[in-house]
Amino acid sequence: MSYDLAVWEGELPADDGAAGEAYDQLYALYMEGEELPPTPRIRAYVLALLERWVEMTDDEHDVSPWSAGPLMDEASGPFVYFTMRYSMCEEVSAEAARMAANHGLVCYDPQWERLRPTTDE
């Protein structure tokens, strides 16, 4: 079982509903459409994640939180959709959401259909 987050460049949506609509459009465009190299901001964000947590493909001790790798392969243009192991999702998703905000990016949780980080994170 995995837990997913989507992160993208753009204006912060007004609410969770607007974020869900933006997510649906961006996912269809960038994950189901033609694959593009990640933009510089998305690339910097993914590299920051990999500075914090080991890449799944380099994980010899089962400590990587990622469910797929290489993580950079999950990015396309101004959008990245990544999965993490459910057993590590609480800590990792909260920190990944904070890191996205620090990079000026939008973070959306498609399971709970809400923007992240939340006010209690």
What role is predicted for each listed range?
Residues 1-121:
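Acidic (Asp/Glu-rich) sequence patches and key acidic residues
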